[in-house]
């Protein structure tokens, strides 16, 4: 039987692994050309900044799902959150590896982003499982739109980053649909607007820091 202490310890372990350990993917990184494309310094800097933002998004996804898994009392729903977290863990590994390849660093504020997202996830879980799932749906839909915009902004020659972002976008859509199928309630419009504003702050800051 899983106790509250077990769940709390698992959440703490997940936070430490996300922030300080090298992430490992359970799936192979999306197919890229056998020979890496040479990017100009300008294109490399742009790709690095965009992939840093995407990496921050995956750090936050780990925090959100960990908090919601901790907060729910429904064992089936907890498994749903943990499964999604594992799939998002692939994204975390892919984006971190791509940052390394581009010679770019992760955001220096990752511990802050993680803490904020974990807090939001706990608040969402306290509102009830269906609203918590609604929070997942809206988060994933916003991330999906954000990734679509990155596909438009990434250099055409950066096939590696584009392949990763395209796969991530498809996965986010599946996570949103799965949450809807699990009984998600739609969030009020003001909450959606607040989430967009918070995401805008995060992406703007993470692009640079």
Curated annotation (Swiss-Prot):
Binding site for Fe cation 2: 88, 140, 172, 175
Chief location: membrane
Catalytic activity annotation: a 5-methoxy-2-methyl-3-(all-trans-polyprenyl)benzene-1,4-diol + AH2 + O2 = a 3-demethylubiquinol + A + H2O
EC number: 1.14.99.60
Cofactor(s) the protein requires to work: Fe cation
Binding sites annotated in the UniProt record for Fe cation 1: 58, 88, 91, 172
Pathway: Cofactor biosynthesis; ubiquinone biosynthesis
SUPFAM superfamilies with a match to the protein in the record: Ferritin-like
Bilayer topology annotation: Peripheral membrane protein
GO MF annotation terms: 3-demethoxyubiquinol 3-hydroxylase activity; metal ion binding
Disulfide bonds: none
InterPro entries documented for this protein: COQ7_proteobact (IPR047809), Ferritin-like (IPR012347), Ferritin-like_SF (IPR009078), Ubq_synth_Coq7 (IPR011566)
Superkingdom of source: Bacteria
Keyword list, A-Z: Cell membrane, Iron, Membrane, Metal-binding, Monooxygenase, Oxidoreductase, Ubiquinone biosynthesis
GO terms under biological process: ubiquinone biosynthetic process
GO cellular component terms, semicolon-separated: plasma membrane
CDD domains, per database record: DMQH (cd01042)
Cellular localization per UniProt: Cell membrane
Cofactor note: Binds 2 iron ions per subunit.
NCBIfam families attached to this UniProt entry: DMQ_monoox_COQ7
Role summary: Catalyzes the hydroxylation of 2-nonaprenyl-3-methyl-6-methoxy-1,4-benzoquinol during ubiquinone biosynthesis.
Family, similarity comment: Belongs to the COQ7 family.
Classification via PANTHER family: 5-DEMETHOXYUBIQUINONE HYDROXYLASE, MITOCHONDRIAL, COENZYME Q10 BIOSYNTHESIS PROTEIN 7
Protein name: 3-demethoxyubiquinol 3-hydroxylase
